[in-house]
Amino acid sequence: MATYVLGIADRHSDNIMVKKTGQLFHVDFGHILGHFKEKFGIRRERVPFVITNDFVHVINRGQTKKGQSKEFEKFQKSCETAFLVLRKYGNLMLSLFAMMISTGLPELSSEKDLSYLRDTLVSPTKSFYYFKKC
């Protein structure tokens, strides 16, 4: 959910690592706040977030169909809860990102760059719709 809210792009299996404990962690944060990669004028990320069949397989303990298991329902509920927590602290996140505008990050150089963050934090209904659709 954090990658969705922060608009972190270029998410693929080479940028998501797994620790021996089973915890996931992300690397390569070169594209944030909705500055998605394009190739030949085509936006590479076409949906707000992606849950691959491999991830569904792991979540469902071997099943590949989304929504077919209690594990997937628990995962979905956990994502919704995580979003609500992020949303609760949305003003703080916006303030912290606003303070970073002068740091020289190429994708955070003006107040306009904060609009993606504002938009993702606006509506839980819209976010839950995207999540359930994926």
Mark where each language-model region is.
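Conserved kinase catalytic-core helix
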Residues: M1-A9, L24
